[in-house]
Design a protein with these regions (language model features):
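Active-site cofactor/co-catalyst pockets and adjacent glycine-rich loops in catalytic enzymes
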Residues: 301
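Catalytic core of soluble alpha/beta enzymes
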Residues: 154-291, 305-317
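Short helix/strand-capping turn motifs
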Residues: 294-297
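N-terminal capping/lid subdomain adjacent to the active-site entrance of alpha/beta enzymes
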Residues: 1-173, 180-187, 192-195, 308-328
């Protein structure tokens, strides 16, 4: 029996405007994919990202283009041959995992031969704002074990971190420049931030300029985000970074994410598992990939006004294992 593929666009308003170095947004625009074999269906969600030349239209077009192939070979390995890494493949890959688990009447991790996931502690992200405002938000969230701070390279980033550390002195900090710094700013900030509770700096330089990181000291762990997509990009990161950020919208799904995690660990990289801003449906596969990671950034639903039905349970910054009614 032929499978049925349904593709939907969804808009999820954010709790407040979220700003990074490249711009801001008030709504998360996602695409969901449902794949049904007539009796059971699996779901996946992705976030088309302009940084990677993705739009809602382009991602939809990619998914529509492979429906004939999915009818012939509805399997994840074949999917990797017909779609490149990216948001479209992520939604389909995760939907196939969900469908396979339902057909096997087991949880996804059992199907994959993995141990059952445990609850994870996620960072909580503060978008870019004036130093005083970010300091206020840090105080409101000072009970959280780890905060992630978006930076811009506008000359006020040290003031931001200083104010945040003052208002949340016992909280670990992760700084994310989203490619917004120069090498001079990195050299200036890194040793100073180390004294302010910062444990990691994420993607300080533009991806096409990160070779400069290989020739300077790293007083704080440096993590590749925009420079790291899938296993094919991994070897080029050696000597520049100590950690990689695995996002399923970059890897093209959980299948590649699990392989990237293993390959990166074998090369000595620490692991971070991150996300775009999406609902719990997008976070649930990330929770599987995030087992044992040094840093987990799966706070997307906490930034939304509302989450979808059967969403993940967050107790403070702790994420509990997803219900099978959600995914997997």
């Amino acid at each position: 029996m032929a499978i049925q593929v349904n593709i939907n666009r969804e808009s999820w308003p954010l709790e407040s405007e979220f700003r990074i170095s490249r711009g801001s947004r008030k709504v998360s625009e996602v695409i969901t994919v449902s794949i049904s074999d007539g009796n059971l269906s699996g779901r996946g969600e992705c976030f088309p990202y302009a940084r990677y030349n993705e739009t809602l239209d382009s991602v939809e077009k990619q998914i529509f283009s492979i429906i004939p192939e999915l009818n012939e070979k509805p399997c994840r390995e074949y999917l990797r041959k017909v779609l490149p890494p990216g948001a479209a493949r992520n939604a389909v890959d995760c939907a196939l995992w969900d469908l396979e688990a339902k057909k096997a009447n087991c949880r996804m991790w059992e199907l994959a031969g993995l141990s059952a996931p445990e609850p994870l502690t996620t960072v909580y992200t503060l978008g870019v704002d004036e130093p005083e405002k970010m300091g206020e938000l840090a105080f409101e969230n000072s009970n959280r074990p780890i905060l992630k701070l978006k930076m811009t390279g506008d000359g006020f980033d040290f003031d931001r971190v200083e104010r945040i550390h003052k208002n949340a002195p016992n909280t670990k900090l992760v700084v994310d420049a989203n490619e917004g710094w120069t090498i001079e700013q990195y050299v200036e900030y890194a040793p100073r931030f180390k004294k302010l509770g910062v444990i990691m700096i994420e993607q300080p330089l533009p991806a096409d300029q990160d070779s400069q990181l290989a020739s300077i000291p790293h007083p704080i762990t440096v993590c590749a985000d925009e420079s790291c997509h899938d296993t094919s990009t991994l070897k080029g990161l050696v000597g520049k970074y100590e950690m990689i950020n695995i996002k399923l919208d970059k890897t093209g799904g959980l299948t590649e994410a699990l392989e990237l995690k293993e390959a990166a660990s074998n090369l000595g990289f620490q692991i971070m598992v991150g996300c775009m801003i999406g609902t719990s449906l997008a976070m649930a596969p990330g929770l599987v990939a995030g087992q044992g990671a040094s840093v987990v950034d799966l706070d997307g639903p906490l930034l939304l006004k509302d989450d979808r039905e059967h969403g993940l349970e967050f107790i403070g910054s702790t994420i509990n294992v997803p219900s099978s009614l959600l995914w997997g």
